[in-house]
Curated annotation (Swiss-Prot):
Belongs to the conotoxin O1 superfamily. GO terms for cellular component: extracellular region; host cell presynaptic membrane. This is Omega-conotoxin-like Ai6.3. One of its GO terms (molecular function) is toxin activity. Disulfide bonds join 53-67, 60-71, 66-75. InterPro entries: Conotoxin. Keywords: Calcium channel impairing toxin, Cleavage on pair of basic residues, Disulfide bond, Ion channel impairing toxin, Knottin, Neurotoxin, Presynaptic neurotoxin, Secreted, Signal, Toxin, Voltage-gated calcium channel impairing toxin. The presence of a 'disulfide through disulfide knot' structurally defines this protein as a knottin.
Length: 76
């Protein structure tokens, strides 16, 4: 019985400690995510989802065009 109570107290303490030591800005995490999504809807050209790159075996000019980042006349 004592061991069970001790385990419950330990779990509650560790749970509380996790919340206390969490990232200070975590309370605004959803708000920041919403603002970022709203910005991407207003400026679709700036969205990271619109990033286009070439798959391996496709001809390329620079490494920036390849999804892997490696270009030697063909994306690697």
């Amino acid at each position: 019985m004592k061991l069970t109570c001790l385990m419950i107290v330990a779990v509650l303490f560790l749970t509380a400690w996790t919340f206390v030591t969490a990232v200070p800005d975590s309370s605004n995490a959803l708000e920041n995510l919403y603002l970022k999504a709203h910005h991407e809807m207003n400026n679709p050209e700036d969205s990271e989802l619109n990033k286009r790159c070439y798959d391996g075996g496709t001809s390329c000019n620079t490494g920036n065009q390849c999804c892997s980042g490696w270009c030697i006349f063909l994306c690697l």
